[in-house]
Amino acid sequence: MANSDSTAPGAIPEGDAGNPGSAAEAHLSVDGVQMVRLLGPQDRLLTTLERQYPLVNVHVRGNEITLAGDPTQVAAAQRLVEELLQMVRNGQELSAAEVTSSARMLGSDLNLSPSDVLGQAILTARGKSIRPKTLGQSQYVDAIDHNTIVFGIGPAGTGKTYLAMAKAVQALQRKEVNRIILTRPAVEAGERLGYLPGTLTDKIDPYLRPLYDALNEMMDPELVPKLLAAGTIEVAPLAYMRGRTLNDSFIVLDEAQNTTPEQMKMFLTRLGFNSKMVVTGDITQIDLPNSASGLRLVTRVLNDIDDIHFARLTSEDVVRHSLVGRIVDAYTEYDARQQARHYEREQAAEFANRAERRSGTPRDHLPKRR
């Protein structure tokens, strides 16, 4: 990208950032790139950019982009466009997720380069690149590279399981491991699969189908059944991990919030030589009836052990429809309010019990008000 006013990239070309009443204007020339790749079909990505900087007017004419308005936001928008252009030149296909995530990243730390953070592809499968789309996802992927056991904890839509499976496929393709093992607890059946009708495949398929679907997206669908038949890829309920030692394997445990503490301990102690484990889950979606979550407990038990990393993803890492992130935030706030009310009720009950013990008079026998 060339700046027709000879302003250094990222600088405010006109106006005064220290004077909020002044206006700034930046002129950017896009060379060697189709504008539709930068701005999106029907300028959808341009619309996303404008939402990030409401005090900036964006005008596009040919391959020229003009940004005008608040000096601080003009500078930020210019930096964002430059980063997006670099991604396009690197061969990356842009979506609204990259635009939003890049703007958020630059807003938190100007020293970050979204084109570097989001530019590293894990896999290219069926013409589609699988890569981190947020800073949190990028840090999660880096943690998988540098630790033997990684816990990816966060709400739905943060890519924690999908990215873990992509890293597993990458490790297999690079011959870093000999097999992939994907597992999750069949909590809806209480792991008592023998009581369900049909063959073993019929019984476990509904619980493991999301993992099969992801595999078919990442690999040749004709190759997946062969790898499954050969045992190179294994997809099984958590109960089938008991009593095994898993060497030379990349193991992914999904829906770990629905493991009991005993199941979590059993799973983690299956780790063998030259193996890697990724455990994913959302501690706000525990489906266990009247039982503690192994994922919730393990964050306290293993928090200070070397070579074990806890990656915590948030609503900012949700890469589904933008509304999903707002839904996650709303439920998080609701749960926090409910927990606060529960705590207040417990405190009030404890206070009443103390008062009762001091007075020696049970509350049931206190005189009633008339």
Residue ranges and their predicted role:
Residues 1-14:
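N-terminal acidic, proline/glycine-rich, low-complexity intrinsically disordered segments
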Residues 18-37:
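Short glycine-/aliphatic-rich beta-strand segments at the starts of folded cytosolic domains
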Residues 51, 58-117:
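Interdomain "pre-motor" coupling segment immediately N-terminal to P-loop NTPase/helicase cores
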Residues 54-58, 310-311:
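A short linear hydrophobic-aromatic micro-motif
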Residues 68, 125-137, 146-253, 257-370:
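Conserved helicase motor core of SF1/SF2 NTP-dependent helicases
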Residues 108-132, 137-138:
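P-loop NTP-binding catalytic core
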